[in-house]
């Protein structure tokens, strides 16, 4: 497995080691992130840490200036480091982020099968959606594809299989020419050690307090154009609900600061909360809303469900596929403040229903969405394609 960063792999890679299917893990993280932190023997991990420090140094000194060409250089640097420690395997599983072409070429040279994992929709679809959104917000000119995104598109077409966290992502790549029959969808999981339901006593207390405490809507996401915060703000402005509050947790991008200024006083903002500390914010809220324009999955939806919240999110968010509308959440169209307002008001007027939907979300998360379950499905996929590949070679 190779990933130029950490992303979600640290949540389940220990299960691959336990099952005996992991040969080596190439990644890029700070020096403090060692094999023992991942549940792996040091002999199986290769950390291209210099890339990670170079990226952070560039961001500190230059910000966004020359980001694309320098990151492309850093990515190639990481790949060459990985190749110096290469070990042939039956399957290369790698995250598609425009930084794998050398590794994919080497894997094919070795006769290995290659699984590429895109975490967002195809770059062309993503560009179209974001260009429309930038124009709508009036915050910047049209975005053009950069070399890293073009590399991602090219890499996808050289993979034997794609692994997607949602059907939304799978359909996007299929529209752009990748064989639909070679795309496997496995929804991502949630760490149930950190994100857990309320205790029975807490739940009873929350039920008793329904009529006396404020109704809280929470959104946890970076505040960037892609996440669609303005549609939630417009919905909130329409509703004017008494004894209610809107909480945003997430860093604000420079491009969104002037946009948010138009809604000053309408919401409470916390710039950063460590992931393992989010539970208390979820558990003291009533509804989770994520109005994304595009989101390949959105782990925060699964986290909120595991903590007992009904979820309102858009059809362009992969995690929407987890929802049973009316039972544990609602799906709404993108860019529809009216639809968001309608669902929020429904739960505001029926707070007992919101509590019951949150309980249903809890049960689903606990039964179906642990990372151990994800790893089981992934290992089954590895074995399936290896068996198919072996038969093809024999014939």
Give, region by region, the residue ranges found by the protein language model.
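Carbohydrate-associated surface elements
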Residues: 168, 189
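Acceptor-binding helix/loop patch of EC 2.4 sugar-transfer enzymes
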Residues: 56-69, 110-150, 193
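A short, well-ordered alpha-helix in the C-terminal region of glycosyltransferases
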Residues: 346, 353-368, 374-377
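Conserved acidic donor-binding segment of nucleotide-sugar-dependent glycosyltransferases
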Residues: 325-326, 330-337, 346-351
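Short hydrophobic beta-strand element within catalytic cores of glycosyltransferases
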Residues: 310-313
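Aromatic "clamp/platform" in nucleotide-sugar-dependent glycosyltransferases that forms part
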Residues: 293
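Nucleotide-activated donor-binding/catalytic signature segment of Leloir-type glycosyltransferases, i.e.
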Residues: 256-279
């Amino acid at each position: 497995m190779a990933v130029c960063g950490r992303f979600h792999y640290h949540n389940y890679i220990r299960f691959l080691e336990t099952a005996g299917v992991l040969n080596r893990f190439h990644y890029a993280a700070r020096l403090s992130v060692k094999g023992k932190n991942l549940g792996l023997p040091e002999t199986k991990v290769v950390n291209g840490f210099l890339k990670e420090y170079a990226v952070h140094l560039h961001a500190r000194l230059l910000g966004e200036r020359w980001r694309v060409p320098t990151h492309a250089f850093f990515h190639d640097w990481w790949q060459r480091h990985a190749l110096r420690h290469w070990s042939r395997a039956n399957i290369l599983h790698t995250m598609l982020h425009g930084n794998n072409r050398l590794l994919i070429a080497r894997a094919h040279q070795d006769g290995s099968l290659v699984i590429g994992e895109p975490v967002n929709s195809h770059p062309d679809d993503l560009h179209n959606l974001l260009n429309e959104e930038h124009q709508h917000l009036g915050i910047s000119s049209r975005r053009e594809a950069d070399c890293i995104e073009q590399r991602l598109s090219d890499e996808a077409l050289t993979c034997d299989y794609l692994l997607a966290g949602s059907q939304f992502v799978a359909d996007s790549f299929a529209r752009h020419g990748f064989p639909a029959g070679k795309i496997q969808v496995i929804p991502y999981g949630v760490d149930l050690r950190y994100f857990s339901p309320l205790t029975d006593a807490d739940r009873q207390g929350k039920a008793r307090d329904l009529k006396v405490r404020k109704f809280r809507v929470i959104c946890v996401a970076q505040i960037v154009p892609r996440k669609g915060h303005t549609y939630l703000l417009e919905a909130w402005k329409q509703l004017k609900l008494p004894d209610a509050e809107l909480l945003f947790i997430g860093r604000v991008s420079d491009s969104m600061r002037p946009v948010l200024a138009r809604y000053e006083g309408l919401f409470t903002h916390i710039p950063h909360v460590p992931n393992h500390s989010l539970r208390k914010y979820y558990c003291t809220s009533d509804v989770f809303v994520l109005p994304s324009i595009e989101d390949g999955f959105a782990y925060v939806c699964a986290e909120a469900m595991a903590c007992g919240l009904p979820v309102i999110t858009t059809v362009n968010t992969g995690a929407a596929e987890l929802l049973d509308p009316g039972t544990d959440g609602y799906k709404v169209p993108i860019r529809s403040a009216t639809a968001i307002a309608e669902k929020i008001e429904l739960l505001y007027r029926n707070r007992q229903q919101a509590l019951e939907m949150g309980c249903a979300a809890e049960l689903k998360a606990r039964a179906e969405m642990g990372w151990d379950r994800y790893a089981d499905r992934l290992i089954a996929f590895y074995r399936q394609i290896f068996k198919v590949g072996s038969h093809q070679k024999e014939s």
